[in-house]
C-alpha cells in the first residue's frame, strides 16, 4: 500500500504542477508583447550588440595570439 500511496501522491503533485503552469503561463497576446519589448527586437540595439561582440572577439583573438599578459598592462603603469 505504501507504494500505491507514493504513486498516487506523485501523480497528484505532477497534475497540480501542470495545472499551476497552465494557469500562470502567459497568453498569446502577452507573449507577443513580451517579444516586442525584448532588446533584440530593436534593430539599432541589435547592431550595437553585434559591434560590441565583434570588438570583444577581436580583443580575445589578439590576447590569444600574444604571449604577453595583457591583463597586467591595464593596471597601474610602473
UniProtKB/Swiss-Prot annotation:
A GO CC term attached to the entry: mitochondrial inner membrane
Record topological domains on the Mitochondrial intermembrane side: 27-78
TM spans (from-to): 6-26
Signal peptide segment: none
A Pfam family the protein falls into: UQCC3
Membrane topology: Single-pass membrane protein
InterPro entries noted in UniProt: UQCC3
A GO term, aspect molecular function: cardiolipin binding
Cell compartment(s), UniProt: Mitochondrion inner membrane
Example GO biological process: ATP biosynthetic process
Highest taxon in the source lineage: Eukaryota
Keywords linked to the UniProt accession: ATP synthesis, Membrane, Mitochondrion, Mitochondrion inner membrane, Transmembrane, Transmembrane helix
Mitochondrial matrix face residues: 1-5
Chief place where the protein resides: mitochondrion
Family from the record: Belongs to the UQCC3 family.
Subunit structure: Associates with the ubiquinol-cytochrome c reductase complex (mitochondrial respiratory chain complex III or cytochrome b-c1 complex).
Functional summary from the UniProt entry: Required for the assembly of the ubiquinol-cytochrome c reductase complex (mitochondrial respiratory chain complex III or cytochrome b-c1 complex), mediating cytochrome b recruitment and probably stabilization within the complex. Thereby, plays an important role in ATP production by mitochondria. Cardiolipin-binding protein, it may also control the cardiolipin composition of mitochondria membranes and their morphology.
Protein name: Ubiquinol-cytochrome-c reductase complex assembly factor 3
Organism of this sequence: Danio rerio
UniProt gene name: uqcc3
Amino acid at each position: 500500500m505504501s507504494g500505491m500511496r507514493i504513486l498516487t501522491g506523485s501523480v497528484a503533485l505532477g497534475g497540480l504542477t501542470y495545472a499551476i503552469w497552465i494557469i500562470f503561463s502567459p497568453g498569446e497576446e502577452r507573449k507577443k508583447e513580451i517579444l516586442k519589448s525584448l532588446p533584440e527586437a530593436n534593430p539599432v540595439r541589435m547592431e550595437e550588440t553585434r559591434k560590441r561582440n565583434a570588438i570583444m572577439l577581436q580583443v580575445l583573438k589578439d590576447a590569444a595570439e600574444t604571449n604577453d599578459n595583457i591583463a597586467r598592462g591595464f593596471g597601474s603603469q610602473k
